[in-house]
């Protein structure tokens, strides 16, 4: 799935669109996508100018955006729905992510009850687990 289809599924836009491509999707189960980290991203002007490091919170946001894509594809559409992050749990960051890295993000649906979905996600760089997190999202009708 390319960036055009991604932009049709989730509302995020530059500079906050943090998924570049979806490589695999197994509806109602899991999704694998990538984020190419480049020095031109605005967070690197202040985090940190001498040694740019991808903020952990943005890695978690990329995981959550991938989850929103999985929800949209699994439901068939989210045009009349919104996906909101409710909780973030057990986030761990094991390695620095910097410009030039490609984040391979794997997100799995752990549980789904009514409009509350639970996920677990990992980020790998060159096959090495770099970050992981569990989070919960709520799917609501648009107002």
UniProtKB/Swiss-Prot annotation:
MF annotations from Gene Ontology: (3R)-hydroxyacyl-[acyl-carrier-protein] dehydratase activity
Record-stated family: Belongs to the thioester dehydratase family. FabZ subfamily.
One Gene Ontology CC term in the entry: cytoplasm
Gene for this chain: fabZ
SUPFAM superfamilies per UniProt: Thioesterase/thiol ester dehydrase-isomerase
Name the UniProt record assigns to this protein: 3-hydroxyacyl-[acyl-carrier-protein] dehydratase FabZ
Domain of life from the UniProt record: Bacteria
InterPro entries, alphabetized: FabA_FabZ (IPR013114), FabZ (IPR010084), HotDog_dom_sf (IPR029069)
Documented EC number(s): 4.2.1.59
GO BP annotations, alphabetical order: fatty acid biosynthetic process; lipid A biosynthetic process
Subcellular location: Cytoplasm
Function: Involved in unsaturated fatty acids biosynthesis. Catalyzes the dehydration of short chain beta-hydroxyacyl-ACPs and long chain saturated and unsaturated beta-hydroxyacyl-ACPs.
Keyword line: Cytoplasm, Lipid A biosynthesis, Lipid biosynthesis, Lipid metabolism, Lyase
Catalytic activity: a (3R)-hydroxyacyl-[ACP] = a (2E)-enoyl-[ACP] + H2O
């Amino acid at each position: 799935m390319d960036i055009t289809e991604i932009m049709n599924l989730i509302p995020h836009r530059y500079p906050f669109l943090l998924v570049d491509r979806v490589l695999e999707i197994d509806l109602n189960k899991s999704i694998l996508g990538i984020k190419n980290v480049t020095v031109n991203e605005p967070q690197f002007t202040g985090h940190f100018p001498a040694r740019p490091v991808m903020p952990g919170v943005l890695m978690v946001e990329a995981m959550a955006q991938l989850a929103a894509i999985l929800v949209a594809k699994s439901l068939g559409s989210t045009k009349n729905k919104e996906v909101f992050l409710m909780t973030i749990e057990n986030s761990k960051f094991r390695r620095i992510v910097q410009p030039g890295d490609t984040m391979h993000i794997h997100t799995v649906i752990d549980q789904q009850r009514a409009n509350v979905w639970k996920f677990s996600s990992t980020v790998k760089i060159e096959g090495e687990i770099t970050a992981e997190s569990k989070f919960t999202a709520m799917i609501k009708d648009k107002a």
